[in-house]
Design a protein with these regions (language model features):
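A structural boundary/capping signal
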Residues: 1-240, 248-250
């Protein structure tokens, strides 16, 4: 039988992507580290931040101008300058950078968790945006007047084409134009899966079997596989999804 704390996560993961609450699911990932985490309190904090961003944008908004670079820059300025969010360059692999509650408390994180903060604040402020599961560095995209604009959530910069070439060069062996498919919007499950893979890598490198198993159990709910089941069992756990049961994702 699955652990009780996985039940709500599995229920949310079974929803259609449009109905999946990204912030809630991301906060539930932290429940293994923080039992009894007050998820609703953190959602309320995002609501307050989103309302603040919406208020800042009111003075800027003009009819037909909701996709301007100036509007996106204003929203980013609110998150990074006024609220004070920043990338944690000093301790990039601190697991607290991957727990959304810690990111909201400490206001530092890595690209993917800062992207979740951006996406949640933007959604509440009326700024259209989506995550981008770019290799090696998660991004955020927002519609612009002449095509999508891309944001580095680590520092809140709007990226130029050359910036994207350099980012792609980190995994391609030299600056080069990324395949357009790498810049497509990521669905919410992809965001959660990538968050879990980051934590998986951290705890595997540390040899932290207990925390690694907890992450793998959540990962298997999103991406069931025999390989994951075997790894969970090898770590002393029980697969949340028995092989005879239907998988949540097809």
């Amino acid at each position: 039988m699955p652990r009780a704390e996985l039940t709500l996560f599995a229920h949310i993961a079974a929803r259609a992507d449009g109905d999946l609450d990204l912030a809630q699911a991301a906060l539930l990932i932290a429940e293994d580290e923080y039992p009894g985490l007050d998820v609703a309190a953190y959602i309320e904090r995002l609501d307050v931040m989103g309302a603040g961003a919406r208020k800042v944008l009111l003075d800027l908004d003009k009819p037909g101008d909701r996709r301007s670079q100036a509007r996106l820059e204003c929203a980013l300025g609110f998150v990074y300058r006024e609220l004070g969010f920043a990338g944690n360059a000093a301790d990039y692999y601190d697991p607290r950078n991957s727990w959304l509650n810690d990111v909201l408390d400490r206001k530092v994180g890595i690209p993917i968790t800062l992207a979740v903060v951006l996406l949640e604040i933007f959604a509440r402020a009326g700024v259209e945006a989506a995550g981008v599961s770019f290799p090696g560095h998660f991004l955020v995209r927002s519609p612009g007047p002449s095509g999508p604009m891309f944001v580095d959530p680590f520092d809140g910069r709007i990226l130029s084409r050359e910036d994207l070439r350099e980012l792609h060069g980190r995994v391609a062996g030299g600056p080069s134009d990324p395949d357009p498919r790498l810049l497509e919007p990521a669905d919410k499950r992809q965001v959660l899966i990538r968050m879990l893979h980051n934590l998986r890598g951290i705890f595997a490198a540390r040899g932290d079997r207990l925390r690694l198993r907890a992450i793998l159990e959540r990962l298997e709910i999103l991406t069931p596989s025999d390989e994951l089941r075997r790894e969970i069992v090898s770590l002393g756990g029980e697969s949340p999804i028995p092989p005879t049961k239907s998988r949540i994702l097809n």
